[in-house]
């Protein structure tokens, strides 16, 4: 089932996501919904907070890109980056920030401990686009968005677009959840 994606300024995107203790039917259903939503948008990565669930869980699939056609879709649960190497700037976008892009500097390769869709422990090295997408999605699990990593000059360039997103003035080609602001009296 395609589920709506939470948009910039929604509180769930700023929370530290909770670790999972296992994979049950509910998590399996969530994973299926996340893949379907990601493919429909279309996107190449999606973290649970982006669909309103504050859990340390993400899915990704970069096989739509010719040079990564042999990379299988991934489920990553409770990820922990344990080592990084090199740095590279690259343009990023995000389904929670429709229409917005910016250059982000990130490590070009990472070593990652995580659990797979069977909740089996894994440790692997990732580089290039796969490392970038993993880091981008892990940021979501830590309550961080790619715009938080922009250089000040770059951030100033996109501030009007961020303000428009926060106030609901944007166009998305996929279902979204608009943030609700609660007045605290």
From Swiss-Prot:
GO biological process: co-translational protein modification; translation
Enzyme nomenclature, EC number: 3.5.1.88
Protein name: Peptide deformylase
The record's free-text note on cofactor binding: Binds 1 Fe(2+) ion.
Keywords in alphabetical order: Hydrolase, Iron, Metal-binding, Protein biosynthesis
Pfam families: Pep_deformylase
Xref: InterPro entries: Peptide_deformylase, Peptide_deformylase_sf
Residues engaged in binding Fe cation: 94, 136, 140
Catalysed transformations (reactions): N-terminal N-formyl-L-methionyl-[peptide] + H2O = N-terminal L-methionyl-[peptide] + formate
Active site: 137
Organism: Chlorobium limicola (strain DSM 245 / NBRC 103803 / 6330)
A molecular-function term among this protein's GO annotations: metal ion binding
Gene assigned in the entry: def
General function of this protein: Removes the formyl group from the N-terminal Met of newly synthesized proteins. Requires at least a dipeptide for an efficient rate of reaction. N-terminal L-methionine is a prerequisite for activity but the enzyme has broad specificity at other positions.
Keyword Iron (UniProt): yes
Keyword Iron: yes
Coiled coil region boundaries: none
Cofactor: Fe(2+)
